[in-house]
């Protein structure tokens, strides 16, 4: 992830980084190593750090056991990704001096995919130099991020049938599922491999981490309708019109006021705040799912025992 001062610099840097398959898989690709890339972007006064650092497809910790093995020296920050949070990342000792960012990427224009994660940063003014100074000085006041279990690579799972599997059993079976699909290591297990502590050790500068989930998905679960249907999108828009933002609805607005607008949604918001919503962990490329019963706890218990349960 590169934070760039302005559009002109972005164009210059893009031309320098251009490669034959730059649009492969919807992501820019480059021939440069992490260390070379770091040195290059510094010439343009940019900030750089690994995006979704722990994810199994393209994350930095997929290929390296240390951030210094990738970049040669310390980058400016670590972006955690949807499938991890501060509590997971702060079990890795080498990350204690890095500011954490939560900046979700977007693969569609739907509101529930935009701005799923963001940072609260104290700025002197609305400028790149102020943003740079805040990140360098670790003046991040809060990270807002998806509940990690909802991330589509949180748990080790098959990329074809999406069943969860014990990572050690997956290794024994050469990461092959009985359905013929490939098992992809989850962020949860990858962090356990490189972790130095059983419990997180937060440095003094580490800000609070506020867990979120997309409001449209809560509405979808309550009304048992697809998240992009007119029903769900209409209910979502009505709440936004009345309260302003998803954060105000999920975190700040009173349950009583929400109930006046949509009495069916207010219990779901209350359950979210009380952490009583049940989550099917995501894995293998499939997002986690939310429910208001325990129907998915059995699935996890069964699939984490043996490969024969797939």
Q: Where in the sequence are the language-model features?
A:
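Short acidic/histidine-rich active-site segments
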Residues: 97-113
